[in-house]
From Swiss-Prot:
The UniProt record lists the keyword Secreted: yes
InterPro entries: Glyco_hydro_53, Glycoside_hydrolase_SF
Record function comment: Endogalactanase involved in the degradation of plant cell wall polysaccharides, and more particularly of hairy regions of pectin.
Protein name stated in the entry: Probable arabinogalactan endo-beta-1,4-galactanase A
Subcellular location: Secreted
High-level lineage: Eukaryota, Fungi, Dikarya, Ascomycota, Pezizomycotina
Length: 349
C-alpha cells in the first residue's frame, strides 16, 4: 500500500485533560432548597449533570476554621465524596484562611502565628499534612492541591506579604511538603495559583522572585501553574495576552498550566470595566458563553503544557454575578435552577 496516496484526514482536536468546575457552594445551595435540573428539565444531582456533560474534575475551596462551618474540612469531605462517586477527580484549593483569600485578602487563620515565620511555617506544614491525611483516611484521592489561592500579593499576611518573598517561599515550601509527606497513596500534583493570568509581567515577577537563587522554594516543590482569567475586570485581559502569558509560563518554568477560574456573562448591562477588544464580538448570552469557552479552551489546548480550564461557581444561584459588575455569569438559570446549554461547551473543550 502506498501511504502517500492516502487522503489527509483532519486531526481531531484533543480534549483538555481537565475540564472542570468549582462547585464549592453546592452543599450550601442545596441546604437553601435548590434542586438542579439537567438539560432535559429533570431534577438531578449537580455533580452528575456536570459529569454527564463532559466535566471531569471538581475544584473546591477549603477554609481553616470558618465561623459557620462553610467550606471547612468536613464540608469538603462530603463534597469530594460526591465528586468521586460521579467519576470526577478532586482539586482541593487551600485558602490558608478562615475566609476568602485573594489579592485583597490573605488573613492568617485565628490562632496561627502572625509574628514568627518559623512557627507559621510549621503550622502550614502540619495543617496541610493533616488535611491530606484526613482525605487519605477517608479513601478520597486528590488529583491536585493548590497551596494558596490567588497569591500574587502573597499569603498569610502579614508574615507572607510581598515585602518578604523569602517568607512567601518558606510558606509555600512548607505547604508543598505537607502534601508530599502525607499519607495519600498517590501524591497529588501541587499547584501555585495567581490572578490576572493574562499579565505576563506580573506572573514573571512573582515566579522569578519567589524562585530566586537561594530561595527555600524550588521548582521541584510544585508541578502546576494555575491562573485566574476574568475578562470583565480589565480591558487588557485579552485572549491574546493570556495566550502569550500561558506560553511563557510553561516554557520559562517547565510546568503544565491551567486556567483555574473563569466566567462569561449571559447578562452584563453596565460593566464596570471595558471588555477586551478580542472578545468584543462575543455576546452576553448562553451562546456567548459557549463561544467564549471554546475560544478559551483552544488557547489553553494550543499552549505547550496547557492542561485544563475550570469554570468558577457555575451554579451559585444565590450569587449570580459572582462578585463582578455583571448581572449573571452562571451556567445555570437562577430562575429555574436548570443548567444552560453552555454547560456542554465546558465539558467539550
Amino acid at each position: 500500500m502506498l501511504l502517500s496516496f492516502l487522503p489527509l484526514l483532519p486531526l481531531a482536536t484533543a480534549a483538555l485533560t481537565y475540564r472542570g468546575a468549582d462547585i464549592s457552594s453546592l452543599l450550601i445551595e442545596e441546604d437553601a432548597g435548590i434542586a438542579y435540573k439537567n438539560l432535559n428539565g429533570q431534577t438531578q444531582a449537580l455533580e452528575s449533570i456536570l459529569a454527564d456533560n463532559g466535566v471531569n474534575s471538581i475544584r473546591q475551596r477549603l477554609w481553616v476554621n470558618p465561623s459557620d462551618g462553610s467550606y471547612d474540612l468536613d464540608y469538603n469531605l462530603k463534597l469530594a465524596k460526591r465528586a468521586k462517586a460521579a467519576g470526577m477527580s478532586v482539586y482541593l484549593d487551600l485558602h490558608y484562611s478562615d475566609t476568602w483569600a485573594d489579592p485583597s485578602h490573605q488573613t492568617t487563620p485565628a490562632g496561627w502565628s502572625t509574628d514568627d515565620i518559623g512557627t507559621l511555617a510549621w503550622q502550614v506544614y502540619n495543617y496541610t499534612k493533616e488535611v491530606c491525611d484526613t482525605f487519605a483516611a477517608n479513601d478520597i484521592a486528590l488529583e491536585m492541591v493548590s497551596i494558596g489561592n490567588e497569591i500574587r500579593n502573597g499569603l498569610l499576611w502579614p508574615l507572607g506579604a510581598t515585602d518578604s518573598y523569602p517568607n512567601i517561599a518558606r510558606l509555600l515550601h512548607s505547604g508543598a511538603w505537607g502534601v508530599k509527606d502525607s499519607a495519600l497513596a498517590t501524591t497529588p500534583q501541587i499547584l501555585l495559583h495567581l490572578d490576572n493570568g493574562w499579565d505576563w509581567a506580573a506572573q514573571k515577577y512573582f515566579y522569578d522572585t519567589v524562585l530566586a537563587a537561594g530561595s527555600e522554594l524550588t521548582s521541584a516543590d510544585f508541578d502546576l501553574i494555575g491562573v485566574s482569567y476574568y475578562p470583565f475586570y480589565n480591558a487588557d485581559a485579552t485572549l491574546s495576552a493570556l495566550k502569550t502569558s500561558l506560553g511563557n509560563l510553561a516554557s520559562a518554568y517547565g510546568k503544565k498550566v491551567l486556567v483555574v477560574e473563569t466566567n462569561w456573562p449571559v447578562a452584563c448591562p453596565n460593566p464596570e470595566y471595558q471588555f477586551p477588544a478580542d472578545l468584543a464580538d462575543i455576546p452576553f448570552s448562553v451562546d456567548g458563553q459557549s463561544t467564549f469557552l471554546r475560544r478559551l479552551g483552544e488557547v489553553v489546548a494550543g499552549t505547550d503544557g496547557g492542561a485544563g480550564v475550570y469554570y468558577w461557581e457555575p451554579a451559585w444561584t444565590k450569587n449570580a454575578g459572582l462578585g463582578s459588575s455583571c448581572q449573571d455569569n452562571l451556567l445555570v438559570d437562577y430562575n429555574t435552577d436548570q443548567v444552560r446549554a453552555s454547560i456542554s461547551a465546558l465539558g467539550g473543550i
